[in-house]
Amino acid sequence: MSDELTEARERVRRLEAVVEAGLMVNSTLDLAELAEHVVSIATRLIDAERGSLFLVDRKTGSLRSMVAQGLSTGPLTVEMGEGIVGAVAASGEAEILDDPYADSRFEPKVDHITGFQTRSLLTVPVRDREGMLIAVLQLLNHRSGRFSAADVEFLAELGIPFAIALTTADLHREIVTREQLRREVRLAAEIQRALQP
């Protein structure tokens, strides 16, 4: 009974976090702030040491880190299919690695640069409503055990508000760009009329 109660409490805690992230979607168009918040929630509730979120660049197809906790060297860029993040992006399937150094796809250069020791990884694709890959969320080093299927499920749910926010921000940016273009066209037409005899 005690284990069931503990599991139920954990599920409630995680659902509350998804709701919290969902509420934040309505309060900001700042994707960097939202990404930080989502990664922070994920690392806290899954009890991971660090987390990162890689956004898919729609022009190049590569992935660029929006959040990389503990990394001060600037954004990382990963090609589709490269490393664990790129492999998850290419396959669209979440992965749990209990010993990343034993996996030939793991790239230890970030560990070497930062002095951090990656012992385990949980990497999950984030999709929009149409099922298009928009980001990859990765957690490093579970503090109190191993990453689980329940953790994968939670990260997938937590990615939904971020996907909605990204879509909303893209639409907002598109509307602002169109409106700016309309103003410029109107201004050009007014200037042209003013210059005509």
Where are these regions (language model features)?
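Short beta-strand-to-loop transition segments that serve as allosteric relay/switch motifs
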Residues: 71, 136-145, 166
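Regulatory cytosolic signal-relay segments
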Residues: 163-197
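Flexible loop/coil segments at beta-strand boundaries within sensory signal-transduction domains
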Residues: 41, 57-60, 127-133, 142
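Signal-transmission linkers at sensory-effector interfaces
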Residues: 1-33
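Regulatory sensory and allosteric helical modules in signal-transduction proteins
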Residues: 56, 64-66, 73-109, 117-122
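Amphipathic alpha-helical "output/dimerization" segments
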Residues: 129-132, 146-170
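Helix-loop-beta substructure at the N-terminus of cytosolic sensory domains
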Residues: 19, 25-66, 74, 82, ...
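A short, aliphatic-rich beta-strand micro-motif
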Residues: 119-128, 135
